[in-house]
């Protein structure tokens, strides 16, 4: 019995995760406590068995490479690099959000000395930790310091990088600016690289590529702080280009000596996009220069032989296409430039200079990009292209036109001056014409036909009302009441003869220069209305009755014109509310416009001209 008990104790001690008697949720030996504590102890035993199995598997050398990579990936998320990177990202993100809410768009200026102190402190910290990768493996006394041991200096470099990111982000956000960041050496990439180097026990002395890579990362952060201290943010791209070109030259020499496979995986993964972009740019420039060299004609009239090449517009305006400010990193600009060079192949059609479209957006859409002008709504009224292509400023055509037009301009100016002097001495005052009865009679007989306008309507009223009570027209027939008041017939005949002679003299006086009296057909047409009313009416004609008749006709004419038909010219049902451009026809409704557009109509239904677009209007009728 004792032997069996001792063997059980040895078995439990060899597997410590089985002994969970000390762990309990409810203390005591009651049935309720055992029911609760048994699943809890069973779960703890299972977790202990899994942990023991994991430790033994990691220590064994027979583990497959794929399974080891899975273990390394899981272990990275619990490493100090990943945890610190996650905490820094959350803190900076919350700071940016809360500061944007509290700031409320107002610009705040921080003291320069405060930001300079923190930037200088970041530079000092980065310089101190950079002594590790630069002097590692050398027999220097500084390596005796425990802070520069291989197990600790990678973590110190990572902490220095995190401090540099915090200083740059916080102080640039407080100045309402954008922080300067490096695309090659982000905090997350450095955490993965440092964890891999620590987990694999990589020696810096055996891998100088890691030393150069860490040195480039530190120099990029120091460069950011220096341009912030000296206020040279616009020159950051220049300094970054010089530094990266030197590093690319080193990588080229390194690949030439040991091959591409000799580089560590993290170095190849980080710098391959930059190297690929630089290769595309160099290859494009080389092909462009060779094309220019082939087209170059030393004896030709044209000085520039590359204008017909597809790359020529970009070579002249590449700064506008890239739209850089100088604050960008070299890797980001190289990638952007390479993408710009490669995106042109998607826009090219049969190689006819369609690689790079115009930068300015046109006012109207090209006709081949929409089905019909009835479907192209214009936000502004259509403007016809009335631009004239003038010759250049120093062209020979302009000089010839100037010399030809100069004498004509002088002659025109002289004529103008002589005319002003000549007409300046003339008396242009109008002579007053006596307001007598025969002249008024002549004026009435020479009036034009009645026009359908409101102004002419008022003129008719004034003309008929201001006429004197005496009537001298030949077709006037006095009433019987008026004839009784006359003296006798002989006096009337004498007066009429005198009046006729006076009228004939006035007509001769106001006739044309050739003394030929022309027949006034307007006067005949005006008297036809009086004759017609005389034949249709038995009453005596008076001036008031004629005036009432003419005014009623004018009112009827205005009434008919004001009632304009606003129904659609196509369906005759809906109200028209669409203006077509550029013909300006206001003829159709919205439903008919959509129907005509979907059917592919491109001409106006009224004038048959080309339709480029339409505008919606809201007509207001008198009935409303």
Curated annotation (Swiss-Prot):
**GO term, biological process aspect, one:** protein ubiquitination
Membrane topology listed for this record: Multi-pass membrane protein
Positions of region (Disordered): 467-490
Give the Nuclear compartment stretches of this protein.
91-116, 174-209, 295-624
Broad class of where this protein is predominantly found: nucleus
Q: Where is the composition biased (Acidic residues)?
A: 468-490
Compartmental location: Nucleus inner membrane
Q: What class of enzyme is it?
A: transferase
User: Where do the record's glycosylation annotations fall on this chain?
Assistant: 2, 19, 29
Q: What does this protein do?
A: E3 ubiquitin-protein ligase which transfers ubiquitin to substrates promoting their degradation. Part of the nuclear inner membrane (INM)-specific branch of the ER-associated degradation (ERAD) pathway, required for the elimination of misfolded proteins in the INM, a specialized ER subdomain. Required for ERG11 degradation. Negative regulator of SPS-sensor signaling. Together with ASI2 and ASI3, prevents the unprocessed precursor forms of STP1 and STP2 that escape cytoplasmic anchoring from inducing SPS-sensor-regulated genes in the absence of inducing signals.
Transmembrane region(s): 70-90, 117-137, 153-173, 210-230, 274-294
Protein origin, superkingdom: Eukaryota
Gene behind the chain: ASI1
Q: Which residues lie on this side of the membrane: Perinuclear space?
A: 1-69, 138-152, 231-273
| Self-association and partners | Component of the Asi complex, which contains ASI1, ASI2 and ASI3. Interacts directly with ASI3.
Among Gene3D superfamilies, the record links this protein to:
Zinc/RING finger domain, C3HC4 (zinc finger)
Q: Which reaction does it catalyse?
A: S-ubiquitinyl-[E2 ubiquitin-conjugating enzyme]-L-cysteine + [acceptor protein]-L-lysine = [E2 ubiquitin-conjugating enzyme]-L-cysteine + N(6)-ubiquitinyl-[acceptor protein]-L-lysine
Record-listed E.C. numbers: 2.3.2.27
Q: Name one GO molecular function term.
A: zinc ion binding
Q: What is this protein called?
A: ERAD-associated E3 ubiquitin-protein ligase ASI1
Which keywords does this chain's UniProt record carry?
Answer: Glycoprotein, Membrane, Metal-binding, Nucleus, Transferase, Transmembrane, Transmembrane helix, Zinc, Zinc-finger
What organism does the record attribute this protein to? Saccharomyces cerevisiae (strain ATCC 204508 / S288c) (Baker's yeast)
Q: Which residues form a coiled coil?
A: none
A Gene Ontology cellular component where this protein is annotated is: nuclear inner membrane
RING-type Zn finger ranges: 568-608
Q: Which InterPro entries match?
A: Znf_RING/FYVE/PHD
PTM note says: Glycosylation is not required for ASI1 function.
Q: Which Pfam families match?
A: zf-C3HC4_3 (PF13920)
